[in-house]
From Swiss-Prot:
One of its GO terms (biological process) is L-methionine salvage from methylthioadenosine. The keyword Hydrolase does not apply. This is Methylthioribulose-1-phosphate dehydratase. It comes from Lodderomyces elongisporus (strain ATCC 11503 / CBS 2605 / JCM 1781 / NBRC 1676 / NRRL YB-4239) (Yeast). Coiled coil: none annotated. PANTHER family: METHYLTHIORIBULOSE-1-PHOSPHATE DEHYDRATASE. GO terms for molecular function: methylthioribulose 1-phosphate dehydratase activity; zinc ion binding. Keywords: Amino-acid biosynthesis, Cytoplasm, Lyase, Metal-binding, Methionine biosynthesis, Zinc. It is an enzyme of class 4 (lyase). The keyword Glycosyltransferase does not apply.
């Protein structure tokens, strides 16, 4: 989990304060961040949305976006560690370039008027995000501490998979298949109502970065998944674009919440179709 937030960065709810803060940025950065579709601005937007959903409270969780529609699709913007996600600003992102994960920009480089000398730390999720980008060519990767994600892993203690079938919301998720020719996992459509959604569950570790090996193993072993659950911790979800990742995350959380209620009432998560 991220460390407590001690920073005094600007309140993102105040548009006036945000506009005033822009004057401390270089003209180049001012131009970048004036675009509402810039990945850094989208991270801020999603962080506030996810905070309202109780997915990234208490500085927990993280979001990263690869600039797939920009001039350099290898650029990845990552929210820092230990900041209140609902108050984050676009200039507080770390910028990394794939495939070598070269650090191009940190929020510690921006004028102190914007940070009040707060020392930003890279997200502990960074190596896990990088795994999703390299292994699945993702356009965005989301990590939340959703209570639904945590609870379902508790209910499935000792199990390595979450499975659910015959639920309409499953159709919001992609159908993926490993292509032997390209050696890549490719989207071939969407899951159908009668399909079984399978999400691997990995065990938590004391430090986030120590999850990297088990996350990579799950990604290799489950080519059909767009997410990995971390027991007693949360979930990682990725998609080909930021908006697809958002949709997948929302759909999965809906299914997790429903699955918890189904378990509580004794309804099997996977429908028996043999009778």
């Amino acid at each position: 989990m991220s460390a407590p937030c001690n920073c005094t960065h600007a309140d993102s709810q105040s548009l006036t304060n945000t506009n005033k803060s822009f004057q401390h940025l270089s003209p180049e950065l001012q131009k970048q961040y004036s675009d509402p579709q810039h990945p850094a601005n989208l991270i801020c937007e999603l962080c506030r949305l996810f905070y309202d959903n109780n997915w990234v409270t208490g500085t927990g969780g993280g979001i990263s976006i690869r600039d797939v529609e920009g001039s350099n699709p290898n650029l990845v913007y990552i929210a820092p560690s230990g900041v209140q996600k609902e108050r984050i600003q676009p200039w507080e992102m770390f910028l990394v370039e794939l495939p070598d994960e070269k650090l191009l920009q940190t929020p510690n480089d921006i004028p102190k008027e914007l940070t009040k000398s707060y020392k930003y730390k890279p997200s502990a999720c960074t190596p896990l995000f990088m795994s999703c980008y390299k292994m699945r060519d993702a356009g965005a990767c989301i990590h939340t501490h959703s209570q639904n994600a945590v609870m379902i892993t508790l209910l499935l203690e000792g199990q390595k998979e979450f499975k659910i079938s015959h639920i309409e919301q499953i159709k919001a998720l992609p159908k993926l298949k490993y292509n032997e020719e390209t050696k890549k996992v490719e989207k071939i459509g969407s899951l159908e109502y009668y399909d079984t959604l399978t999400i691997p569950i990995i065990e938590n570790t004391p430090h986030e970065e120590d999850l990297t090996d088990s996350l990579q193993e799950a990604i290799r072993n489950y080519p059909g998944t767009s997410a990995v659950l971390v027991r007693r911790h949360g979930i990682y979800v990725w998609g080909e674009t930021v908006w697809k990742a958002k949709v997948y995350n929302e759909a999965i959380d809906y299914l997790l919440e429903l699955a918890i209620k189904m378990r509580q009432t004794g309804i099997p998560l996977v429908k028996n179709t043999s009778t």
